[in-house]
């Protein structure tokens, strides 16, 4: 297994050490700021690379939303035949060139990188430190001394007796869980079209994910090194910001965010929505700043 993941260890460690090399002259080679920013830099690079997958995820989610009426019709028609229902669903997905698993692509793509980073940081936390990838023995010794708000980045909640480590870990886990919850809720409240929640498979899955993912982070986070928690907290924050931008600037048709955008455009244009005139200028109003010509008076004949 280790030999298979060696290229990933090399890639992850090379990115971290390259960013570290740029920041070390400013903050110091053993500084927690240097190593923390190196991990954050890794997140930014990965998320930029994953933008095409994110675009595909958005398109797939919108396609699935548009197919909801047809999916409900298939479920009603073949409610007593699960196999036929699955076959018809797959036929529908194929016909419209969409994939219900596309929304998982960004997470799946990050999983190997996440595991590689976990292994690299876990090796740093061992006594003596174990190097992976392109890290030298001097690098792992420096990294082992690096601290994030007083807590070594290689320490874990369960593996340390330090109160500082436990406090920092709990704060990071809480931040991870909160950003995951708010990101998912933002999508459900603002980014999805209004639809009947009864027998709606997609909406039910979204509701499950809303509460399940934060719980998973809370349970598993106690085993992660602080450096990994920094990575995951940063990627969650990026996801929230990226989704906020998409919902604000390019919302899904039929969603509350889309309606808000249409009303905003209508107010600017002074058009009518749902029978109500929105800021429509009066035609007889004079344009501000335009000079009016004086009316000429007719002279009386003598």
Where are these regions (language model features)?
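Membrane-interface starts of transmembrane alpha-helices
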Residues: 30-42, 168, 202-206
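Membrane-interface amphipathic helices and adjacent TM-edge segments
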Residues: 46-115, 181-218, 244-248
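Hydrophobic alpha-helical transmembrane segments and adjacent short intramembrane/lumenal linkers
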Residues: 115-260
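Extended low-complexity intrinsically disordered regions
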Residues: 35-38, 42-46, 50-54, 58-59, ...
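Cytosolic, positively charged, low-complexity intrinsically disordered regions immediately flanking transmembrane
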Residues: 239-302
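Alpha-helical transmembrane segments and their helix-entry boundary regions
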Residues: 39-40, 103, 227-229
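Interfacial loop/helix-cap signal at membrane boundaries in integral membrane proteins
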Residues: 1-37, 133-164
